[in-house]
Amino acid sequence: MDTRGYSETKKGRYPVGKKSLESPNGYSNYGTSMDNELSSEYASRGMHIGDLENLVNEIEDEWKDLGREDYQPISTALELLDDSSFGRDYKSFLNVYDRISAALQTIAHTHKDDFTRGISAYGEIMEGIQKCNSRIIALKQSLEASQECIGNTNSKELQQTLARSSQYKKVISVLKELNEANQLFDNFHTLVDSKQYYHASDLIRRVWDELSRSDFDGILVVEQFKSRMTGLLSHLEDILSEELVSITFLKDAVAYPIVSYCSPNPLRETSNPYFLRDFLKNNANTSTLGQSEQLRYLEEALSLKLSDCLKMDYGRDSLRDIRIVLESLNLLGKLPNAISSLKSRTSAEMFTTVDSTSRAIVNKYSLGNNVSTVNPFSKSLYDIGLHAETDREHTMISEFLTNLFTKLRCVLMHYRGISEFMTKLETKTPKHASSSHKSSIMSVNSDPTSPKVSKFDTSDSTFPFDTLLQAFESEIRLMLKDYLISKEEYIENSGNFVVGTEMSIYNLPGENEEDKLFDVTNEIAVENKSNAFYARINELVNEKAPELILNKSNASVSTIELFSGSSKEIVRLAGHVVFVGPSVFHASSVLPQTVFFLEDSVSILKNPNIPPQFAVNFMKEFLRGSYIPQLYKFMSSHFDTIMKDVGAFQLHRDWKIYSKIPIFKCHVAIVQYFHDLQDYLPIVALNLVEFYELLHTLLVRFRNHCSDYLSDLCRTAVLKEYKHVNEDTEDVDDTVRVKLLHDDVTYPQFIKFLKQKNPSLEGLNELCRMENKRLLQYEDRAITSEVKLPVSVLSKDSDLVNSVSYLHNSMEWFLQRCFSRFMNGSRRMNVLQQNQANFGGDFLPIDNLLGNNSDLMKGAYKEVFDSLQRLQFDALLLIRMEVRLQYIHSINQSVNLPDYVVEYRGRPDASIMALNSTIVTTNLKLETCLNEWERRFVFQGLSELVDSSLYSIFYKIESMNRGSCLQMLKNMSAMIQILKTVKEIHGDVEFPKSSRVFGIYQNGAKKIIEHFIAAPKKELLPDVKQMVRIYYQRLMKDAKRNGRDDLYRQYQKKIGSVLTQFDNTVGGARKNP
């Protein structure tokens, strides 16, 4: 057995191994390829390498010595010859030998070609080894030569050689990096055009990071490449910054889902008519359905990760787009620049948003042409020149505000999203990235975990919430002023505000080109009166910059509030197009949506740096600082228009439609005016206490107008009736009679009596007696020497009674129409017509407005009611007083004091006849002007007053003949007949005291004395004594006039004796009844 061949074959397996086939040329994979070829051939011939391995493994297990390096064949032969237990089985060895021989023959037959190629490969390998040995020897010789050369070369030359070597390596590296970076410019525009901004930013940053390594420092071509990339970076920054502004302010017409969430709910206003009151009181603590949907949508958008946003298509959702833009800017280290740009553009973009929305409405409704509007309002408003809101104007304003506030809500949510995103950025920004505009990016590492980068710090760049609030408050304030506030209310159709066909830079709206040129800051103005100067400017502008000549809109142009200077003072510049004229009546369209937007803004901008009361404070500031003063000017202006009308205090031509008694035109107009204000300003009337404060002020002024009218009425009547009297005298003082009313002690009692629902007759009679007593005191000047009764202005041709009665009626109607809550059932008759009755309660619904805190306002209105009612009672009491003054004045005219000596004429005196004529005329006028109860109230107690006045005159007479007494009785009879026709409330018309004294006196002194002594009565004693004095004083005056002093003393003694006799007679009658 050729065991050596087997052993060598066993050991010779290594030539086909991987390590032994490594050629000196470095082809390390040669052995592997050979094994693969053999394996494939074995497989094709039906034998596998695995079968040979099993046979070899079996030989190694049973015949281990055969595979050893130091194998000795003789030892195996001895073992085979040994038959003892220590020997080996010879037959088994032969069996193995046969198997191996057969296997080798099979292998030799099968792999004959393989062995041939193996021998060839072995030869090639050995040749390669020899070549490698030759190279090693050559290298060794080169190293020895280099060492010898180095010994002869200085270090400077070596350094230069080393530097050149490094430069060559750097050039190779730069060329490789530049080759890869050059692909950036090919991919960048593709990514930007497809709006893959994040991937474009990531690409720029990665390339920049590679080129920013220290290996490339100082290489000119790299610096030039980076300079080119800086321009690309600036371009991308501009694109991202503009994209951020565009998305934030919805500059592109993209149907973002956020628009539907920010659209107002049309049922929101009707659900709570007191929304403005609750808003100003900060009672709207519960969020509405719309606010909840907005916040839910915002939370969902904020909860998304950057990876989720990148998976979605760009342009489908604004908040996700903003997230991608912010992350892209932060990746480039340009986020502070973008936020600063957004802050600086906030005011201008907010202005553009409002302006574009306004112009869209103008274009939609074609407001360039004159538009006629239909008047849907009551005639009263247009009678006094009010411009109330039409249906067309309401539609335009509502649509404008809906679109505007939808956009502004989106803007606020975008700002909220930006602020939230900036606190949770997932990308990294360079630590030392410059915040200056267009700054160069520093070296960064794109690895998010790199220590060279850090998160964006929002504290380094204050988020511009303050600028946002200032901008939208400015725009909203401007919008409110444009449509609610104006210096003068006017009636003009939309689009009629046209001054010229063109507008240039020097002919701004509202400016006169003859005064100033291009004066928009009020700081620098070129003033020139020369027409040639402006012609030359116009020529230059048309020639050099024709685009500056703008076609002027036919619509009205408002003003805009912008920030200027460090002080941020508000200045006015030309601004928005206003498609309807300003009017306080637009509040019903403007205020609801404005308040709802402010409520939503508080909900959206939930930030600790924003005061929660900013919206309420803003609305309060506008209402109290602008709208309420403007509303008062408006209300006051048209109130003055009503009251200054020449026919204000004249009967309304259709008074029967409103009242059962005649009333003035101004009272009807004022009630209609107040009613229209509440109808056309329902939001204001239901929510603002200030509205009722303004009404209260107007009511006070209305009361003053009526009071002045009453005073002027009396003064005019005095001057008309007594033209010969000097105006400086007290007789024509128009305040005397009114002062006489108010200063008298009976005045408050009369007011109290008239307020009663069912006044008693006894109480009225008692008041009449007190009144008569006070009048007689004034007549006798018993109070002070300065106060005296004024002259009555009543006459048969005077219209004073009518005017004062109409004032009384008008005040009664006004109070019943407006102040039914305070009447307390005191009215004696409902003077309202059926269409004017307050079936629903009071005209002024202050209870609904003020709730439990209405006591103060109720008290103020109660005071106005009391003053108006007192004025009404003043008018009635004034007529009553004038009638009494007329009687007192006429009676005094008929009696010459102290000597009443006339001839009996058989008819009443002329003054009495004029008095009766005036009273009859007055009564007839009162019958047509006043209710029956008020008319009788005027004359109630008059007969008692006349009787007391005549009785008082009797005691003032010093001498009187019988003819005078008969004339007085005739006058009294005529006055009684007239007083019976006026029909007082109760009682017979008679003069018991005056008729008694003048009736007895006509019998003469002798009969008077005899009759009294025969039947003495104590109650007649003063009267009889006065009769005796009057009789004998006349005789004494005649004796003194004739020089009969003795007779004078005799009559004097006679008076004393008769009076003593009367006293004794009365005393005796008392003792002997």
UniProtKB/Swiss-Prot annotation:
UniProt region (Disordered), positions on chain: 1-33
Modified residues (Phosphothreonine): T449
Comp. bias regions, Basic and acidic residues: 1-11
Alphabetical list of InterPro entries matching this protein: Sec8/EXOC4, Sec8_exocyst_N, Sec8_M
Modified residues (Phosphoserine): S450
Cellular compartments per GO CC: cell cortex of growing cell tip; cell division site; cell tip; cytoplasm; cytoplasmic vesicle; cytosol; exocyst; meiotic spindle pole
Compositional bias (Polar residues): 22-33
Entry's localization field: Cytoplasm; Cell tip; Cytoplasm, Cytoskeleton; Cytoplasmic vesicle
Keywords: Cell cycle, Cell division, Cytoplasm, Cytoplasmic vesicle, Cytoskeleton, Exocytosis, Phosphoprotein, Protein transport, Septation, Transport
Highest taxon, organism lineage: Eukaryota
Keyword Transport included in the entry's annotation: yes
Main location: cytoplasm
Quaternary organization: Component of the exocyst complex composed of sec3, sec5, sec6, sec8, sec10, sec15 and exo70.
Function in brief: Component of the exocyst complex involved in the delivery of secretory vesicles to the plasma membrane. Also required for polarized cell growth and division septum assembly. The exocyst complex plays an important role in the targeting of rho3, as well as the two main hydrolases required for cell separation, eng1 and agn1, to the cell wall surrounding the septum before cell separation begins.
PANTHER family, per database record: EXOCYST COMPLEX COMPONENT 4 (PTHR14146:SF0)
The protein, known as: Exocyst complex component sec8
